[in-house]
Swiss-Prot record:
Residue(s) at site: Transition state stabilizer: 15
UniProt keyword Lyase present: yes
UniProt cross-references to SUPFAM superfamilies, sorted A to Z: Aldolase, post-HMGL domain-like
An example Gene Ontology biological process: L-leucine biosynthetic process
Binding site for substrate: 15-16, 169, 198, 289
Originating organism: Polaromonas sp. (strain JS666 / ATCC BAA-500)
PANTHER family given in the database record: 2-ISOPROPYLMALATE SYNTHASE 1, CHLOROPLASTIC-RELATED, HOMOCITRATE SYNTHASE-RELATED
Residue positions binding Mn(2+): 16, 198, 200
Entry's family note: Belongs to the 4-hydroxy-2-oxovalerate aldolase family.
Native organism taxonomy: Bacteria, Pseudomonadati, Pseudomonadota, Betaproteobacteria, Burkholderiales
Catalysed transformations (reactions): (S)-4-hydroxy-2-oxopentanoate = acetaldehyde + pyruvate
Name under which the protein is recorded: 4-hydroxy-2-oxovalerate aldolase
Amino acid sequence: MYNGQKLYISDVTLRDGMHAIRHQYSIDQAVAIAKALDDAKVDSIEVAHGDGLRGSSFNYGFGAHSDLEWIEAVASVLKHARVATLLLPGIGTLHDLDAAFKAGVRTVRVATHCTEADVSRQHIEHARKLGMDTVGFLMMSHMTSPQILAQQAKLMENYGAECIYVVDSGGALSMQQVADRFKAFKDVLKPETQTGMHAHHNLALGVANSIVAVENGCDRIDASLAGMGAGAGNAPLEVFIATADRMGWNHGTDLFGLMNAADDLVRPLQDRPVRVDRETLALGYAGVYSSFLRHAEAASARYGIAAVDILVELGRRRMVGGQEDMIVDVALDLIKTRQRTTGTSGVAA
């Protein structure tokens, strides 16, 4: 049950939301969104390329600006919220973390695949030495059992992480599965170690799963304005806050300020609607990394293979974050299969 303590509200519009617009926020847009979030009194605002520090690349897509340009601009206008960022070991380095800290970042979420927490040790330990609020971020949490996930969380705690997240990168978890994972966390983590929930809305459960997480002892909730994020988006921040408000939970934010920011600042930027539709539902159904969506749609347009077919096959092969290069391989394999079964040339003109 909810323990009555103030929830920590972590906004991800300027990081996960990057995926929805191919990492193309302008500095002015990022600053306007950050100011609105700060005025609404969220606790932290995550800023980075969608794939974290140093994510701008051929594999993930190039950003309109560097991480440091976005971070410095946002940090310069905040009066309440702290600046957070995301780091994936193997993409971002300790040098990138140092630079982000100097630019104003005070919270870092060190993200690994749900069974690879051991690669986070160096980065978590370094963040603690810098005095940062240090979070372990276990992505694709649906791909392993609650007990194994909890063991991975314990590793991150041992390295120095002060909060560990269940990260539903594929938007594939049910409410019971969320509850089971938080119960497993509470069984092994120290009482003082916080827990967090990062939901995606691919099965339209982003808010529901966040509510269930809080009811099972979760301290921090990730959400984004208008759900701005990969796939069908994250839990929409304004919807979660409205629900929390009706439930009498202490969140400390301005609901109507968030509602205005979602509709006036964020929704107009969506060149592809962030919603549950045929393709994003396929992500949740197949348990596919949500940021694969735009890459799969590009491959679909290029090769004439339905994006849903590509996404379902990616799920069957259990592809994970970092394997974006395999999306084209899957599309080409599906063309070969179609050629064998129909005798057609396969590739669209």
